[in-house]
Amino acid sequence: MVRLTDSEKAEVVSLWSKVDEKIIGSEALGRLLVIYPWTQRFFEHFGDLSTADAIMKNPRVQAHGEKVLSSFGEGLNHLGDLKGTFAQLSELHCDELHVDPENFKLLGNILVVVLARHYGKEFTLEVQAAYQKFVAGMANALAHKYH
């Protein structure tokens, strides 16, 4: 469960209403793959991941980034039960994909950077603090089924 105050929740939801999941998701996932290249092993079937430019322009990275960000958006609708909401996704990443749960934290922190880049002055200290809590809750929920 993420414990956001009413004010924090309003900040997160307000900014999220402006988010283009395709653009922000694509950039966030692309940056994860560039900055932390060991994460590429989960996406080898996506084709060319040989350079930062290739990763950022890769249509499969872009599509998956949008899908990932859509899940974050879904999380906003279930702040009181993120673990239940993402139980199946957690099991998939744990049991089938064998993703290191630390990667969820990395992606969340990159998402915060990308949001700050795109929303500049709107991304105040208070908004960042609220988003850090939210992405930490998402990372915790996605890591919940790990043994």
UniProtKB/Swiss-Prot annotation:
Annotated residues for binding of heme b: 64, 93
Coiled-coil regions listed: none
The keyword DNA repair is annotated on this UniProt entry: no
Superkingdom per UniProt: Eukaryota
InterPro entries, per database record: Globin (IPR000971), Globin-like_sf (IPR009050), Globin/Proto (IPR012292), Hemoglobin_b (IPR002337), Hemoglobin_oxygen_transport (IPR050056)
A cellular component annotation (GO) from this entry: haptoglobin-hemoglobin complex
Keyword Metal-binding: yes
Gene Ontology MF annotations: haptoglobin binding; heme binding; hemoglobin alpha binding; metal ion binding; organic acid binding; oxygen binding; oxygen carrier activity; peroxidase activity
Domain Globin: 3-147
Tissue: Red blood cells.
Keywords for the protein's UniProt record, in alphabetical order: Heme, Iron, Metal-binding, Oxygen transport, Transport
GO biological processes: hydrogen peroxide catabolic process
Subunit-structure text: Heterotetramer of two delta chains and two alpha chains.
Family: Belongs to the globin family.
PANTHER family reported in the protein's UniProt record: HEMOGLOBIN FAMILY MEMBER (PTHR11442), HEMOGLOBIN SUBUNIT BETA (PTHR11442:SF42)
Protein name: Hemoglobin subunit deltaH
